[in-house]
Amino acid sequence: MIIRSPEPEVKILVDRDPVKTSFEEWARPGHFSRTIAKGPDTTTWIWNLHADAHDFDSHTSDLEEISRKIFSAHFGQLSIIFLWLSGMYFHGARFSNYEAWLSDPTHIGPSAQVVWPIVGQEILNGDVGGGFRGIQITSGFFQIWRASGITSELQLYCTAIGALVFAALMLFAGWFHYHKAAPKLAWFQDVESMLNHHLAGLLGLGSLSWAGHQVHVSLPINQFLNAGVDPKEIPLPHEFILNRDLLAQLYPSFAEGATPFFTLNWSKYAEFLTFRGGLDPVTGGLWLTDIAHHHLAIAILFLIAGHMYKTNWGIGHSLKDILEAHKGPFTGQGHKGLYEILTTSWHAQLSLNLAMLGSLTIVVAHHMYSMPPYPYLATDYGTQLSLFTHHMWIGGFLIVGAAAHAAIFMVRDYDPTTRYNDLLDRVLRHRDAIISHLNWVCIFLGFHSFGLYIHNDTMSALGRPQDMFSDTAIQLQPVFAQWIQNTHTLAPGATAPGATASTSLTWGGGDLVAVGGKVALLPIPLGTADFLVHHIHAFTIHVTVLILLKGVLFARSSRLIPDKANLGFRFPCDGPGRGGTCQVSAWDHVFLGLFWMYNSISVVIFHFSWKMQSDVWGTISDQGVVTHITGGNFAQSSITINGWLRDFLWAQASQVIQSYGSSLSAYGLLFLGAHFVWAFSLMFLFSGRGYWQELIESIVWAHNKLKVAPATQPRALSIVQGRAVGVTHYLLGGIATTWAFFLARIIAVG
């Protein structure tokens, strides 16, 4: 008799055909809500429809159904991303000067859009060099294509078609995993499996395949391009992949194949997996061999990380155990209960992810210029400025989103009865101490940082430069930052014995990399001016955090409104007859936080734009003399408010203001138009609902007189809606104004 061990139970993790596919609901706007589905009585209906269409919490309280909707929506989002990417590659294939740019990237600007000659708009097609007329683009796609080894517009065309196929696939997946095979709640809550797949699959194998592509395709093609070989003469990507001898001609160790890997003789691969540091003097970008090495190392780390968590085989970490073991001497129950929060509240989960991704995006912004990863990126000043600005804005929005969803979690998902003495409960119990201290810090930073500028403005007006805070009078040197710079400068050969240059040229040392007579990067000096503006950064960031954190910590209750949780995430005031309780909802804190986020990011991108033009970007003569765009005026001009207004905003706005009649004229119109959108927002922010309701009623009276009154009763926007419309136009107008100002300036002078 054979004794068999019992067969392990196979878990069924999907439900088959849970929701039938039907287009009928598409014809019923608001089908997800009994109230909205009735159709409009007043114009408020359309606003409620938009506010609640994607608020899956309000459609059902079934967590499994909510999870499936979110999961399906993610596939829809991926589909749109693939569609967008396909459009970018298609523009590169069909409307761009990519092949011309590839042959001479220092003298030809990137362009992938040619405006049709309708009512004189062809003026926008500027001469970007090489006889091509079009709009100069600043997205960095050309540089990334060159780094990936794309040598022809046909390859871009094929990639665009591939992306369309993937877009269709994602749309199908979104439908399939909601209507045909929808995962059960247990599948969404299986965090160990998710970690394994995301770490080992997405990040590990993703990085490994990119490293493989770089070694087998990008490196050889870029080596030929750097040597000046005509792109049409270079072998195609598949030839390098299929024919090892081609690679062995460039990198002799390729002839040995995988033998050095299995015999642990890894130094043989040092030809194409390097650890040099610094920039490639030909392209002004990081060494592509360094980048390949980096992705290989990252892949190994994540492949290991992806095998650390316990799934079907009974070994490995369990996340619940890790969290519950996490107790400090002063933290009570510690992280006990956090596992349950993060597996049942997707708002809590999303909040953490947004905070991390937002911070990471800002880190990306700072690395894109200090360690420019793609060839000829560093000398394309318009693209450098655009990438920095873009990633700063995106990071700011994501971080505010983190606070928004943390507050929604507090209002909708937090259960105070089951939480006692864990970290979150302890934070909530001493929230007054946190917020009052943070408030004190904001007041201190605000008065002192701004006070230094006001002092300088006053001394400047009185003609007493010797009494100003500046590099030539009373110095306030950023000694800590300079010490960090110095430490990194000295690292190669000392604490980083294998590296030949420091991680970034910005740290210091005498090195300067110029490509085609333009500065790519050089050591960035920090002085009193930077010390002053960095404290403005500290101030604006702390105020943003104060507003957002107060919104989260007081989302459920406060001394003013003890039952705030019952009023929900967004509400205008605590009912009629209770004065002084407006703008206290968690939503209002997000609303106010957005303005301070806008403040913070604006100061950062202004600082970056001026500092780079003053101290980094410029031209270099045959004798090695560097001439910066604004001639190093940052250190002495930016130490007064007047200097910022006069020598940055006003002086550098001349290009956008005088752009009419040139190929930059669209930026001039955008500059005006975006100012208008911004000003339009003030109408929503500075007036109350009653004013508009009164106005609407007299307009309705006139319509009734003429017997043209609509069946749907017009209503003024609610207080919350008015604020939402206001902040949207404020941010859109402000961002588009900045965009036009920056680009007209940098394309004209850069």
Curated annotation (Swiss-Prot):
Subcellular location: Plastid, Chloroplast thylakoid membrane
Residues at which phylloquinone binds: W692
One Pfam family matching this protein: PsaA_PsaB
Transmembrane segments: 70-93, 156-179, 195-219, 291-309, 346-369, 385-411, 433-455, 531-549, 589-610, 664-686, 724-744
One GO MF term attached to the UniProt entry: chlorophyll binding
Principal cellular location given in the protein's record: plastid
GO cellular component: chloroplast thylakoid membrane; photosystem I
Binding site for chlorophyll a: M683, Y691
One Gene Ontology term from the biological process aspect of the record: photosynthesis
Keyword check for Metal-binding: yes
Gene3D superfamilies, A to Z: Photosystem I PsaA/PsaB
Protein purpose: PsaA and PsaB bind P700, the primary electron donor of photosystem I (PSI), as well as the electron acceptors A0, A1 and FX. PSI is a plastocyanin-ferredoxin oxidoreductase, converting photonic excitation into a charge separation, which transfers an electron from the donor P700 chlorophyll pair to the spectroscopically characterized acceptors A0, A1, FX, FA and FB in turn. Oxidized P700 is reduced on the lumenal side of the thylakoid membrane by plastocyanin.
Record protein name field: Photosystem I P700 chlorophyll a apoprotein A1
Biological source species: Gossypium hirsutum (Upland cotton)
Gene: psaA
